[in-house]
Amino acid sequence: MDSQGKKVVVCDNGTGFVKCGYAGSNFPEHIFPALVGRPVIRSTAKVGNIEIKDLMVGDEASELRSMLEVNYPMENGIVRNWDDMKHLWDYTFGPEKLNIDTRDCKILLTEPPMNPTKNREKIVEVMFETYQFSGVYVAIQAVLTLYAQGLLTGVVVDSGDGVTHICPVYEGFSLPHLTRRLDIAGRDITRYLIKLLLLRGYAFNHSADFETVRMIKEKLCYVGYNIEQEQKLALETTVLVESYTLPDGRVIKVGGERFEAPEALFQPHLINVEGVGVAELLFNTIQAADIDTRAEFYKHIVLSGGSTMYPGLPSRLERELKQLYLERVLKGDVEKLSKFKIRIEDPPRRKHMVFLGGAVLADIMKDKDNFWMTRQEYQEKGTRVLEKLGVTVR
């Protein structure tokens, strides 16, 4: 709470999950899937102890997803369906979750780097007009990640459910001209894993079994350090084979798919996406930065988001960066490689890093009136109020 007794809410709206809670807390109060579902047919009124309503949101929608037509209001970090997004926010602020009177609260929201201004304007409009928050702030996710890590300068590799961003931040300011995005993230890896399991002969349905396969992915997938070696092991031995019990009791065996699915992050052509993978993109981003800042960036690479949680990802990233640096900068001169310092930080709680950074920032700023856009300012200026964030509004 701030000095006037107003609650300060932090809401990190991801493509796949909403993480929400209060300023100063060190963990989100609620984490739930960012989905909205509508029943395909109205046959039963209840399943187990969940009542089927015309509109199901979050956890309930996730549990009954096989009976619903499911929509994700956000795609690749950007809101695509505003009506459904409002349902999601109603659920977040309503009795099911935070249970707050929005008129007496301030809210800190997060957005991906390179977010279209229109998207941000609309978010602010909804927050003030529909929910009547007393103050609103919109922070860039990569900057929050660095705050949570206690840094002001670094490169954030943020890979969530819908989009992967590589975002250099210098002295607390994100550098949009250097920010790169890769439209491969958790959801695409899950889809690819479904495809690989289908090739193995297991019948998975792309929508009904999506959650099941996501769980398999989270439990068993990893990033291979040396891909040729992993493929050899997969072909010639059974050391990689793990059993997994599905919710209905069937047991499946998963082998080479464990590293083949996340490999798409490093080799996008595997899932028919053009462009370079995450390691090369990171290398290109740092090399495009000012020569004086490059060394700082190489020493402060911070991973963030659920799709960076694969075992083996940090070491593979480091290996590829060193390889690229050796080939392209040192032109193969191995002697000089020992001077090349690189550090990849993989904090254990990186799944919720953006929320944690937001909770820290909102707590520090809760009583600083010139930080927040206020309802009064919005009534006077409309969306021009965003100029307070240092955003030019045409």
From Swiss-Prot:
Location relative to the cell: Cytoplasm, Cytoskeleton; Cell projection; Nucleus
Function: ATP-binding component of the Arp2/3 complex, a multiprotein complex that mediates actin polymerization upon stimulation by nucleation-promoting factor (NPF). The Arp2/3 complex mediates the formation of branched actin networks in the cytoplasm, providing the force for cell motility. Seems to contact the pointed end of the daughter actin filament. In addition to its role in the cytoplasmic cytoskeleton, the Arp2/3 complex also promotes actin polymerization in the nucleus, thereby regulating gene transcription and repair of damaged DNA.
Sequence similarity: Belongs to the actin family. ARP2 subfamily.
Any Gene Ontology biological process: Arp2/3 complex-mediated actin nucleation
Species this chain originates from: Xenopus laevis
InterPro entries attached to this UniProt entry: Actin, Actin/actin-like_CS, ATPase_NBD
Record GO terms (molecular function): actin binding; ATP binding
A GO cellular component annotation in the UniProt record: site of double-strand break
Keyword Cytoplasm carried by entry: yes
SUPFAM superfamilies in UniProt: Actin-like ATPase domain (SSF53067)
Protein name: Actin-related protein 2-A
Annotated keywords: Actin-binding, ATP-binding, Cell projection, Cytoplasm, Cytoskeleton, Nucleotide-binding, Nucleus
Quaternary structure, from the entry: Component of the Arp2/3 complex composed of actr2/arp2, actr3/arp3, arpc1 (arpc1a or arpc1b), arpc2, arpc3, arpc4 and arpc5.
SMART domains in alphabetical order: ACTIN
Main location: cytoplasm
Classification via Pfam families: Actin
Positions that bind ATP: G160, D161, G162, R214, M215, I216, K217, E218, G305, G306, S307, T308, M309, Y310
Alphabetical list of PROSITE patterns matching this protein: ACTINS_ACT_LIKE (PS01132)
Membrane spanning residue stretches: none
Signal peptide: none
